[in-house]
């Protein structure tokens, strides 16, 4: 039942895929936590495509953020796709909790589990999209045996843990290499995305862009529109 409901809900929202063009996913890690629900509503009104939710455990990455209860609460604020980026050790322990809380896409790090293929299958069994994230120093070769089983690759263009970091240019070659591995794969880039860095990522093959500090430090609508314009 969870599978059917989540799958239908996801496709009603437009799903993911290159045919849907450029998508902007504001990261609420950079939002004002004292009014998180309002922030989610505001980025929805401003034209965001996804809500990017960074889940951190203080072990896999040096920060603590959101868990399923927070996701469940803000799920009531919008129908936007919830792109849940799980940065925790042994993510398989909490996949079902994130799905039940409202995740539409669950992204896990290749570095966070020794059974990556099993976790991908676990995610997809709940009827949501599965993604794999790579840290800046992780080569794209780790995707070789799972790339046909996933819906998205998230390329970290900063070291995970904190918002507001500078973009690492070396990841551009990684984006290009992933695109060659599978031309129809969605490639999301997370870290240091601004109106100055988005174009080079889009030209390399990325189509989904996480922007935290850039969006939340200005006029949300103007910044989201400018990102979409620059990515074309």
Where are these regions (language model features)?
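A short helix->loop->beta-strand "cap" motif at the edges of active sites that frequently abuts
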Residues: 80, 128, 182-185
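Short, Lys/Arg-enriched N-terminal segments with co-localized hydrophobic residues
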Residues: 2-17
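Acidic, divalent-metal-coordinating active-site segment for phosphoryl/phosphodiester hydrolysis
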Residues: 193-204
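Conserved N-terminal beta1-alpha1 strand-loop-helix module at the mouth
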Residues: 14-107, 111-115, 122, 130, ...
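Internal catalytic-core helix/loop-beta-alpha segment
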Residues: 129-133, 137
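Acidic, Mg2+-coordinating phosphoryl-transfer loop and its flanking beta/alpha structural elements
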Residues: 208-211
